[in-house]
Regions:
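Helix-rich effector regions associated with P-loop NTPase G domains
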Residues: 1-28, 35-36, 41-43, 48-53, ...
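Short, glycine/charged-enriched secondary-structure capping and boundary segments
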Residues: 43-46, 70-73, 99-100, 140-141, ...
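Extended basic (Lys/Arg/His-rich) segments that typically form rRNA-contacting surfaces
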Residues: 54-57, 67
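Canonical P-loop GTPase G-domain recognition
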Residues: 62-127, 146
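Glycine-rich phosphate-binding P-loop
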Residues: 123-143, 173
Length: 283
């Protein structure tokens, strides 16, 4: 698969906005898909954020493999990165996020207190790739009491400071992907979970990747969901057999769409597509 290179103008603009507004926030909240704790982190944004304090939120934890979520949280915490694992389809309490923010910024709050300065409100910027669930997370976090804070520095057209409570203000940013995917596996993982448009990658490649990954890591889930599937067969053979078994005749595209939708909707159960072994190839 060739390198996928693309970068819509609005994403380039959003990247600049993130860079310009960093100075107005106390810390950065990075929202990732818990099924892709590593692959759904935008390396371009990570570089821009630099040494700014970070709160890493593993969203959609209800769709991820809980054992893997635990392992990833332990890894990130060992790297000095504070984490939360949440399901933003359920009510996310402001207190949980605010408490995590206060813990993250405890040293700064203490230093300012010694100087006689009381930090009334912490300010953060939420960044993440498309389809990480950022909008749902913010809506749940703010609820119906959401308040737009105007006349503040750092607010570019199309961006708003949102006051969740007296302790926390949030600057929203659009979901931003990076200019090109040089790692084929990362691109396939993003495609399988719906983080990038289906038109960017051939669906047969995405399906074959998904089948092979589930065969290796979650064979019991494949067997449970697709009872006619002979999981010991190679992926292309499985595709041909299942297309016929499901009455699709030779319409392989129909099986690709079905399989990918089943994975995205969690019909195969909880899964995580990143393993700690992936860190070996991470720069």
């Amino acid at each position: 698969m060739a390198t996928i290179q693309w970068f819509p103008g609005h994403m380039s603009k959003a990247r600049r906005q993130v860079q310009e507004n960093l100075k107005f926030v106390d810390f950065v909240t990075i929202l990732v898909d818990a099924r892709l704790p590593l692959s759904s982190q935008n390396p371009m944004l990570t570089k821009i954020v630099g040494d700014k304090p970070k709160l890493l939120i593993l969203n959609k934890a209800d769709l991820a493999d809980p054992a893997m979520t635990k392992e990833w949280r332990q890894y990130f915490e060992s790297q000095g990165i504070q984490t939360l694992a949440i399901n933003s389809k359920e009510q996310v309490t402001v207190k949980v996020v605010t408490d995590a923010a206060k813990k993250l910024m405890a040293d700064k709050i203490a230093r300012q207190k010694e100087r006689g300065i009381k930090i009334e409100t912490l300010r953060t910027m939420i960044i993440g790739i498309p389809n990480a669930g950022k909008s749902t997370f913010m809506n749940r976090l703010a609820g119906k009491k959401i308040a737009v804070v105007g006349n503040k520095p750092g607010v570019t057209k199309g961006q708003q400071w949102l006051k969740t409570n007296k302790d926390l203000e949030i600057l929203d940013t659009p979901g931003i992907l990076w200019p090109k995917f040089e790692d084929e596996t990362v691109a396939l993982k993003l495609a399988l979970t719906g983080a990038i448009k289906d038109q960017l990658l051939p669906m047969d490649e995405v399906t074959i990747f998904g089948l092979n990954y589930f065969k290796e890591h979650y064979p019991e889930k494949l067997a449970e969901r697709f009872k006619q599937m002979k999981i010991e067969e190679e992926a292309p053979v499985i595709i041909m057999d299942m297309t016929r078994a499901l009455g699709f005749r030779d319409d392989y595209d129909r099986f690709y769409s079905l399989f990918v939708k089943e994975v995205r909707d969690g019909k195969l159960g909880n899964y995580t597509l990143d393993t700690l072994e992936d860190l070996d190839g991470d720069d």
